[in-house]
Each structure stands twice: as C-alpha cells, then as structure tokens.
Curated annotation (Swiss-Prot):
This is Magnesium transport protein CorA. A motif (Probable selectivity filter) lies at residues 283-285. It comes from Helicobacter hepaticus (strain ATCC 51449 / 3B1). It catalyses: Mg(2+)(in) = Mg(2+)(out). Keywords: Cell inner membrane, Cell membrane, Ion transport, Magnesium, Membrane, Transmembrane, Transmembrane helix, Transport. The record marks N259 as: Essential for ion permeation.
Amino acid sequence: MINIFIRRGGLIVRESLYSSDEQIKVFHEEDKILWIDLFRPSSDEVNYISQTYHLEVPTKEEREEIEQSARYWEDSGSITINTYFLVRSLESELHNETITFLLRKNILFTIRYSEFRVFDEIQQIVLATPKVFEDGFDLIGKIFEIRVEKDADLLESAAKNTRALRKRVFNSQVINYDEMLEELSSLQELNMSVRDSLFDKRRAITAVLKSDKADADVKKNITIVLKDLNSLVEFTAVNMHALDNIQTILTNQINIEQNKTIKLFTVVTVAMMPPTLIGTIYGMNFDNMPELHWDFSYPVALVIMILSTIFPIIYFKKKGWI
C-alpha cells in the first residue's frame, strides 16, 4: 500500500493506493507532495516509485547491512537512510527492523514492512497540524523525535523492572532462580535492542546534521533529538551495568546454594565413615573375634556406631559447617 501526503492549500491530505495497478494521480500545480509512505510494498510498487522519482531504492540485502556506508549515503540529489526501529512481533517480543528513508526534492519516501505505532501517530499529527510541516526534512525530524520518546519510555519501564528485580533478589525468602534468570535475560535483551536502535539512529542523525541539504531550523530540531539520544545511550549503559550486577549477585547466590548442598553431602559422608568402618571390622567374621560371642555384642556395636556418627556431627556443628 502507498500513502501519499499532499499539501493542498492550507491543508495536508492523504491519498492511499491499495493496488500496484493504480498509479499516482496527476495533481494540480498548486499541490505539493510531502511524503510517500510505502507500507509492505510489492516489487511493482517499488519499481514504479523508483522510476517515477528517479530513486535508487536499496535492496533487502542492502537494507540489512550494518556498515556505515550502507546505513547512510548521499548524492547530489538525494539522501538515503537505513535505520533500526523497534517493533513488537506477533509473539509480543521487541526486535529491531530496518526502515528506509529517502529524501529527494524535499519529498520524504519511507519503505517499511511492519506496522509501527510511530507512523500511525505521525500521520495523525501531519493531518492535524499541517503548518508545522513544510517538507520531508520536517517530517523525518518529527518521526525520529517521536521514536526517541518511545525508546525513552521503554528504557524507563526496563529500569523500573530492573529495580524491582533487584529488590526481589535481596528480599525474597525463597528464590526461584529459573524465573529470575529468565526475567533477567529478557531485560538484558530489551536493553541491548534499544541500545542498538539508539546507536543506529544516532549515526543517521549525525550524518544528516553534516549534510548541506538540511536547513538551519531542521538541524536545530534534530540537534535536540540527538542530545536526547546521547542521554538515552548513557542510560542504557547504566541500566546494563545494573543488570550485570544483578546477574553477578544471582550467580553468587546459586554458587552459595550449591556449596551448601555439597557441604551437606560432605558432612554426611564424613559422619558415616566411622560407623561404616566399625561395621566393616565386625563384618569380617574371623574365628578369633571374642566380641562376636558376647551376649550384648550386637547392642554394644550399635551404640558405638551411633556415637561415632553423632560426635562428628557435633564437631561440625560447633565449627559452623552445618
């Protein structure tokens, strides 16, 4: 599907094409296209836009490359940006997906293959406040601004959950290590995904600021977004350090529990050695063992074996080993 946002008079209107057979209508001379959003476009739709506006649309392989030259490039007439945006999958898991932004003749082209809330919001804002958006640079600046705000909300929620997890680790009487490790892993994955997304957007915004195609007002607004990005990158580092600290604490507690178990088995083994030795001696059944012929030899042997078990346990108890 192709959504086209056109400035018409004092308003911005949206026209949608749902089929590759449709063609972009011939607009009046006073009409001005601001934004063409390609949502899950077919190859025919991509080719049509590419040929109509003389765009070099990156392939799927080029979109996923991580080199700086593949994430941002600029020529005499256009700017191309491939950058990560977080999206929630059908399994409600957050992951990064590449969105392509192309700027040519002050028109913004976006190519995406998933539904992003930020695009729904920006479309409503564009239609509601047409005076704010003069060209594609204003649009891309607003898109990054809204996405960074959402990233900040995600990090704030992650930090809150991290603090709650830390309290549970210290205060819980009975610790479910499997559950806590699973939650810890989930928080670490979220933090890394947000960090990767922030790093990628920061590279893109830094490159736009160096471009002579963006005017002073656009650069001023994007600079504010960049400052917010830098703050969030620092926040992810702090949050990751807190998560690493929790992981260390959990690992130490697991080791302590394992050591307690090993110590218990060691004490039991040592405590059972004397009675085992006694039982082994009197189980040899040699003829010249007068104790075996006593009437009370069996109860005496049992008492000795019990006492030889109790004394080591008392000793270990005084030492604080059990």
